[in-house]
């Protein structure tokens, strides 16, 4: 099979578009098109060498790569779903907070994929100011040519959200400062859609100060309809993950090992990495089953 045929077959299979393949290979899409049609005027090796390198890399990845299950229906996910449902139905604001690596983000992503009018953004140190987080939300809502001015952004977001009966999820919201949280509160009240603040304990601890009516967070605290703490992964979570990977959850020795990993901070994330490495090892040994060893 010629190099040109291999590339053509990949595109025709629907796995990649020509533009996607060109990006992965690291060549210009127009140049790749010309080469495929035997009309490329430049040096053939300038296209063929990166193609060969990418095909070899892709083959190596195929031999060793093991993809983790995209979403596993764990008990913790249902705690998150219940809070998100409440935020949307009432509508109100909720918090889901606690340890990292316990499945909060994955559950929110699954909820967004399976429900209409759910938008999810992620705060970060670089995207935590009031103007930055409003801009992120505007982009997520599909507002084209979103302005950078805070007042215009806020008005456009309100206009877009009104009447949607939707839900806005803000992950890593522990990064958000007071003025950003206050603006979110005001928007939520005006448009009457649900808002969910997801993050670590800082999300709750800061807002909880509002239980004192003299505290700056008092107005925000009084609008929170539900606070859902997730302090650690449960054994039910770990059992569901083991079964999703095709492991025997009745194997006590195996489950003891998995529980010792999964119940620590960042447990489910670490557990997934361990299982992936174990699966790669098993794949290399042509073994269908991997155990605690």
Regions picked out by a protein language model, each given a short descriptive name:
Residues 129-133, 144-183, 189-196, 233-241, ...:
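Mid-core helix/loop region of P-loop NTP-binding domains shared across ATPases and GTPases
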Residues 1-53, 235-293:
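C-terminal alpha-helical "lid" subdomain
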Residues 71-88:
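Pre-Walker A adenine-sensing motif
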Residues 124-139:
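Conserved phosphate-binding/catalytic loops and adjacent sensor/switch elements of nucleotide-binding enzymes
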Residues 93-100, 187-216:
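Sensor-1/coupling segment of RecA-like P-loop NTPase cores
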Residues 88-110, 125-126:
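Walker A/P-loop nucleotide-binding motif
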Residues 115-126:
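Conserved catalytic segments around the Walker B and adjacent sensor/switch elements
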Residues 117, 210-231:
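A short helix-turn-beta junction within AAA+ P-loop NTPase domains corresponding to the substrate/partner-engaging
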